[in-house]
Amino acid sequence: MSEALNELASYLREARGALIADAEVKYGELTVTAKAENLIALLTFLRDDVQCGFVSFIDVCGVDYPQRPDRFDVVYHLLSPRQNQRVRVKVATGENDPVPSATSVFPGADWFEREAYDMYGILFTGHPDLRRILTDYGFEGYPLRKDFPLTGFVEVRYDNEAKRVVYEPVELKQEFRNFDFLSPWEGTEYVLPGDEKARPR
């Protein structure tokens, strides 16, 4: 399978080298890296080219790298039933740099891009309906960013007396606890009953 993927990577470099920044086969999967401005042309080529035939759109997801200037990777997964192959297309983008929407090439990208927007704040130009899809309308922040607090910003609960949803500041029921310590089974000097044989001498 990796031989066929290497051949496909070589074919993509030859046929559309100007659209591709990198193409590598790693862990039995082909990953193609492109710039945002070349994304739509590359996805169209992968879908329409006879040698490729990546007509099945699987997923779009985001990956957060807060230490990089282009903080996010937008990752597209495609499947070619004819070739029985998968390809991953990666595009790097910054917090305020939009990526062209893939909905013109693959209409099924619609809700996946909305999810990436909702969870990471990744913007997509040309998207027909870019709004939150998983979180509440008034939700603040983007929960899958690595700098999003674990407790969130507000606590949402249903107030049975008021018969409505109530937003309140987060109130921790206990003080923050640091669990960075040795367990009772690590670093002990004594021998527990039954461990005499397992203990090195």
UniProtKB/Swiss-Prot annotation:
Keywords: Cell inner membrane, Cell membrane, Membrane, NAD, Quinone, Translocase, Transport, Ubiquinone. This is NADH-quinone oxidoreductase subunit C 1. It holds the Pfam family Complex1_30kDa. It comes from Rhizobium meliloti (strain 1021). PROSITE patterns: COMPLEX1_30K. It catalyses: a quinone + NADH + 5 H(+)(in) = a quinol + NAD(+) + 4 H(+)(out). NDH-1 is composed of 14 different subunits. Subunits NuoB, C, D, E, F, and G constitute the peripheral sector of the complex. GO terms for molecular function: NADH dehydrogenase (ubiquinone) activity; NADH:ubiquinone reductase (non-electrogenic) activity; quinone binding. Its EC number is 7.1.1.-. HAMAP family: NDH1_NuoC. It is a peripheral membrane protein. One of its GO terms (cellular component) is plasma membrane. It is found in: Cell inner membrane. It is an enzyme of class 7 (translocase).
